Amino acid sequence: MLLTSIAPKIISISEATWRKAAANHSQRIRHLLQPGLTPIEHDINGGKRKRRQQHHYVDDWTALDPVNPIYNFLIEYYGLKGAKGPRRLARWSPDPKLLLGDHINTDDNCKDASSVLSSSVDNGQLYKAAMKASHGLGGIVLENATLDDLGGTLHMRGAVPLPLGEEESDQLHGILYNPAVFYNRHIPLDNNNDDESNQEDRKLQLLKTIAPFQWYTSILKSTLNSDPILHCYGLHEWAMQYWPEGADPPPSAKYQSSLNLRVSRQVINDTVERKGVRCTHVDALRFFAPAAGPLNHHGASLQRMDQLRLEQKGCVHAHMDLLKIGLKLQGFIDSELMVDILEIALAARKLDVEASPYDATGYGAGVVPIETNEGRKMYRDRQVELMLRVEPVRRRLLDAYEVFMKIAFDESLLLRSDEFVGGGGGKRAAVDDDGPYVAPERLAKAEPGGLPWRKNLIEQS
């Protein structure tokens, strides 16, 4: 964890520079999503067609296809529903790492065209407006950005408008981003104006806010330090369809219901039973058929905290989940990194689908027949290739989390948070931890055919 203090500064990015970077980002996102986007005539876009007919401004983003097996995970797993989903991915924001000054790793154009402002420079009015709006914490200013840019071109989360005058106005110097401003770091934890009870309440609320970020930091660290498991062969998809004689129908039998199975039920059963399942992904277990649970070498019932020891760098679903982890930082993460993460997630999903028992060839997917020796070798080769490709992206995401938390939160809270999410000194949190705050979802369990995490909490004595 980075622990040095950050001197407040105003970083200004010229309008031409940030608009070019934002346009390039949107184009890259569109290129990646285009095969999965629905045409405007699709029923799912009915609301957008109506607004267009009423001559309201409507951008040209449409919803992802909910039956496209390569893209529908973005909807089902990560909530990128409707046209709002792709639009969310297409929004741009500057890299907070600019605020650290040294060793900037961001869009080269933004780095070269940005400048550090002080009250003595010609643009003193912009400096004063930015310092006032940021409560003296500074930030990154996108020159001449407007309110109309928010929600379309730029992220709304964390955006601070800088009015031209003393009063609030639609006329702006630009828009400022700084996670420290968004999380009220300008209010000291030892504020003398607050009584002791109010201070403790605020600390607890901040710990609740920090907990998910610290959790994902721990997951990224533990995954990077893990040994890969390269003999799982994507059998989680097969375990979802496992249906031996006398067993109840698998609850996930309707999953990917628009696709036909490319193999028989008997082949599915034989493949799952051959050597069992070696699935380390705790989120996948809940979708297993109940009969497949005992066949998992890592357990038929897992706790969320088990993710810290089980998540490993060979897991295709762990690669996909980098998108979930990155989305938590949107507004405060390098947009170039988000595109790279999306590209990785889609590549992982394609391998996931191609190795499944479904026939997805109608959507441009190939077949990795893991029910055969040749197919298992093919899967392993692809898995290793993808793992090596993901490694630097996962490291960049971990760095983005550490930079974000360094800027956004008081260091003493980060140290306290480290103690109970497994990130400090190798300590692994348990159900009976006496830490100051543990999110309820961390104290939950997953079982085949079981309830969602938040509805399956571990009973504590």
Task: Give the ranges of each region predicted by the language model.
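Long, charge-rich alpha-helical interaction segments
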Residues: 318-364
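Interaction/scaffold regions that mediate signaling and macromolecular assembly across diverse proteins
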Residues: 296, 311, 315-318
